[in-house]
């Protein structure tokens, strides 16, 4: 989310407007964290993850293709997805691997998540500097989310 305000600046928003729109992300993160727990209690968690990824893909692609016209809804679905993904990590690790080695497995998975989260702004910025636009980075992010959704679709049912 480091680049969200610069993305909005690139599509013509003022700094003040871009920061206000980025604030929507914070609200959506909270809602994502709250609602994903409710959802996974009722719906198979990988399906919830796929739905959340699909929403985020739509938000990212809409931002890439339509720019300022969709900034607020894009901010919302991206923020919602960010909030949901963090909670899904712990839930899915517990459901698929149990609690016997939960700390070790969760720690490794979350470390990988954090490394990717830390590197992505650097890569996004480098691509922006090389191309002069965020479009390629947004399309690449959407492609990675499509791959993630396909992987979630392959997950087996939980053991009882």
Over which residues does each language-model region extend?
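Structural signature of the two symmetry-related core transmembrane helices
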Residues: 47-61
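Multi-pass alpha-helical transporter architecture, strongest
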Residues: 142-160
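Intracellular juxtamembrane helix-capping segments at the cytosolic ends
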Residues: 84-97
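Residue-level signature of mid-helix packing/kink "hotspots" within the transmembrane helices
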Residues: 26-34, 83, 114-118
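Interfacial helix-cap and linker-helix signal at transmembrane-aqueous boundaries
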Residues: 8-9, 39-40, 124-132
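Helix-loop junctions at membrane interfaces in 12-TM secondary transporters
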Residues: 65-74
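A late C-terminal transmembrane helix in Major Facilitator Superfamily
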Residues: 97-131
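Extracytoplasmic gate region of multi-pass secondary transporters
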Residues: 1-31, 120, 124
């Amino acid at each position: 989310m480091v680049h969200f305000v610069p993305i909005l600046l690139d599509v013509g928003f003022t700094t003040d407007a871009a920061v206000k729109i980025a604030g929507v992300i914070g609200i959506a993160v909270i809602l994502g964290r709250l609602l994903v727990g409710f959802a996974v209690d009722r719906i198979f968690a990988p399906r919830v993850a796929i739905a959340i990824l699909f929403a985020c893909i739509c938000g990212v692609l809409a931002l890439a293709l339509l720019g300022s016209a969709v900034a607020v809804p894009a901010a919302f679905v991206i923020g919602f997805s960010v909030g949901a993904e963090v909670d899904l990590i712990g839930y899915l690790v517990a459901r698929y691997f149990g609690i016997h080695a939960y700390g070790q497995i969760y720690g490794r998975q979350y470390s990988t998540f954090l490394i990717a989260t830390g590197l992505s702004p650097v890569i996004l910025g480098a691509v922006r500097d090389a191309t002069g636009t965020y479009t390629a980075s947004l399309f690449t992010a959407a492609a990675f989310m499509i791959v993630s959704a396909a992987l979630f679709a392959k997950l087996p049912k939980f053991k009882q």
